From Swiss-Prot:
Annotated spans, Disordered: 1-383, 408-429, 461-485, 537-619
Positions of Sequence repeats: 404-408, 442-446, 460-464, 490-494, 507-511
UniProt organism field: Arabidopsis thaliana
Source domain of life: Eukaryota
InterPro entries: CAP160 (IPR012418), LTI65/LTI78_PGEED (IPR057059), LTI65_LTI78_N (IPR056605), LTI65_LTI78_NYQTKV (IPR057058), LTI78/LTI65 (IPR037491)
Acidic residues composition bias: residue spans: 62-73
UniProt-listed GO biological process terms: abscisic acid-activated signaling pathway; leaf senescence; response to abscisic acid; response to cold; response to salt stress; response to water deprivation
Family to which this protein belongs: Belongs to the LTI78/LTI65 family.
Protein name: Low-temperature-induced 65 kDa protein
Biased composition (Polar residues): 188-197, 245-254, 583-593
Gene behind this protein: LTI65
Basic residues bias (residue ranges): 36-48
Length: 619
């Protein structure tokens, strides 16, 4: 039934204009016009019901209210009664009413003039709602509704031209119910595309015809909107107006020879090239002399010549054209640098990148070596002096190891080392090697200079607080005074292994954080263990050797007393018994073997106290 109601919609329109003709004849009679209005409203309600059943049922209530307003308005305005009905017929989707009204030329003129007054209250509410269902029928049910709008535009063209100001409010009032913002856009009739619904508004708002741009344009658009729509979706990508601009832009991209194409990108490229030249101009210029000697650079300069000749060819890359533009600069040195950069970046061949990346590294290495030499020759503070000394010492440590190994192998100290080896077997082999080296070096080098080292060490300790104890500084001072071999061993001692680090950390914690008593107990225990393991004969021999060497240095008992004072001061404990003090250097030597002079703690014990102890026991 609904579809049947919509299809005879055309016949109902044919009947309605006939009834509208009678009010045209009775136009000046208010009563006849009011009757015609009622009849037309009834027909309009039927059509509305048939249309709104398709999904616009919410319009019934508002339309009924609008009908009430329409009935009141003719009584108020008098003569314009018929005109509102005629306008309703033209707007509600019954375009034949307007067409027949157009046939009666005189009443049509009177018909459209007053609606300017009545359109705002009446047509705004009543006639917009019928338009929505009609437009839905136009879009969904297609061709039947499309034929009618054409009829309206045919008759209403001259009407729209004559009384365009009155019909602008028609368009505004029609779309007022859909949104207040749509009223302002509806007057030009081409703007509210985005504001209105996709189906209705797109078909209506684009009135293509010049004559139909006002009132009939809304109706006739149903036929001719595809033309505008074809242009409109292309508007972002390229409509008739935009396609020309887009095609020009594409030609700019594909063909850089155009003046417009060269205008944008190469300027930015120039700015980038200039930035790089200003940042790296001194290095680049100095580097350019080297780079020209390489065959890859000759290739690149050949490319630069080609870019000079073919600067305007479209096949050129942006970088080469950029190089061509950059060659216009007055200074040729800068031009070469810029051209090198310009070609390296866009072309991106390995020959171009690898020399750039490799040569600066070589140059940086040479500069770094120069910097290192300058730092070594010109240290500013004591800490830097010691750091530079330790770095130089570490470089010579391997040769020093060989020297010490030769000394330990060919002198009589090897026996002492072997005598200590059964005690040191408990520790790792690397630790035993450290202990043996320490025994030999301390016995030979540090004994005659102990007093001097003690004084200098105390002064350096006061001046240079290092991470460990001051004995590490003492050892470094000793190494500087005793020569390259002592420095090498001290540097080895200052570079501990992982095991040595762990031991030195534990010892340092015990020494510095109030663990002196525990350290003394452990030292005495180690002394007892070593006394048990080492034969008494070897201990006596070790003591004899130690006393002999001490007498050669500065006297045995004086040295023993000094060792006692140093050990007790470092360990922060009470002076031990003579037995424990004499044997504690041996245990300290063993612990130094375990620590391997790893850190400040181990170097403390081994540098002075441990050194003397190893001298007593090992030799």
């Amino acid at each position: 039934m609904e579809s049947q109601l919509t299809r005879p919609y055309g016949h109902e329109q044919a009947e309605e204009p006939i009834r509208i003709h009678h009010p045209e004849e009775e136009e000046h009679h208010e009563k006849g016009a009011s009757k015609v209005l009622k009849k037309v409203k009834e027909k309009a309600k039927k059509i509305k019901n048939s249309l709104t059943k398709h999904g616009n049922g919410h319009d019934h209530d508002v339309e009924d209210d609008d009908d009430e307003y329409d009935e009141q308005d003719p009584e108020v305005h008098g003569a314009p009664v018929y005109e509102s009905s005629a306008v309703r017929g033209g707007v509600t989707g019954k375009p034949k009413s307007l067409s027949h009204a157009g046939e009666t030329n005189v009443p049509a003129s009177e018909e459209i003039v007053p609606p300017g007054t009545k359109v705002f209250p009446v047509v705004s509410s009543d006639h917009t709602k019928p338009i929505e269902p009609v437009s839905l029928q136009d879009t969904s049910y297609g061709h039947e509704a499309l034929a009618d709008p054409v009829r309206t535009t045919e008759t209403s063209d001259w009407e729209a031209k004559r009384e365009a100001p009155t019909h602008y409010p028609l368009g505004v009032s029609e779309f007022s119910d859909r949104g207040e913002s749509r009223e302002a856009h509806q007057e030009p009739l081409n703007t509210p595309v985005s504001l209105l619904s996709a189906t209705e508004d797109v078909t209506r708002t684009f009135a293509p015809g010049g004559e139909d741009d006002y009132l009939g344009g809304q109706r006739k658009v149903n036929v001719e909107t595809p033309k505008r729509l074809e242009e409109d979706p292309a508007a972002p990508g390229g409509g008739s107006d935009y396609l020309s601009g887009v095609s020009n832009y594409q030609s700019k991209v594909t063909d850089p020879t155009h003046k417009g194409g060269e205008a944008g990108v190469p300027e930015i490229a120039e700015s980038l090239g200039r930035m790089k030249v200003t940042d790296e101009s001194p290095d680049q210029k100095s580097r350019q002399g080297r780079e020209e000697d390489f065959p890859t650079r000759s290739h690149e300069f050949d490319l630069k010549k080609e870019s000079d000749i073919n600067k305007n060819s479209p096949a050129r890359f942006g970088g080469e054209s950029k190089a061509g533009m950059e060659e216009d600069f007055p200074t040729r040195g800068d031009v070469k640098v810029e051209s090198g950069l310009g070609r390296d970046l866009p072309t991106g061949t390995h020959d171009q990148f690898s020399p750039e990346l490799s040569r600066p590294k070589e140059r940086d290495d040479s500069e770094e070596t120069k910097d290192e030499s300058t730092h070594e020759t010109k240290p500013s503070t004591y800490t830097e002096q010691l750091a530079s000394a330790t770095s130089a010492i570490t470089n010579k440590a391997i040769a020093a190891k060989n020297v010490v190994a030769s000394k330990l192998g060919y002198t009589g100290e090897n026996g002492g080392g072997q005598s200590e080896s059964p005690v040191k077997d408990e520790t790792p082999r690397s630790v035993t090697a450290y202990g043996q080296k320490v025994a030999g070096t301390v016995a030979e080098k540090l004994t005659p200079v102990y007093e001097k080292v003690k004084e200098t060490g105390s002064t350096v300790m006061t001046k240079l607080p290092l991470s460990g104890g001051g004995s590490g500084v003492k050892e470094t001072q000793q190494g500087e005074e005793k020569g390259v071999t002592a420095k090498n061993y001290i540097s080895e001692k200052l570079k501990p292994g992982e095991e040595d680090k762990a031991l030195s950390e534990m010892i340092a914690e015990k020494l510095h954080f109030g663990g002196g008593g525990e350290k003394k107990t452990t030292a005495t225990k180690e002394v007892e263990v070593t006394v048990e393991k080492i034969p008494s004969d070897q201990i006596a021999e070790g003591k004899g050797h130690g006393e002999a060497v001490a007498e050669e240095g500065k006297g045995g008992e004086g040295m023993v007393g000094k060792v006692k004072g140093a050990v007790t001061s470092w360990l922060g404990g009470k002076p031990k018994s003579p037995r424990s003090v004499e044997e504690s250097p041996q245990s300290l030597g063993t612990t130094v073997g375990t620590m391997g002079f790893s850190d400040s703690g181990g170097s403390e014990l081994g540098g002075s106290g441990g050194g003397k102890g190893v001298q007593d026991s090992g030799n």
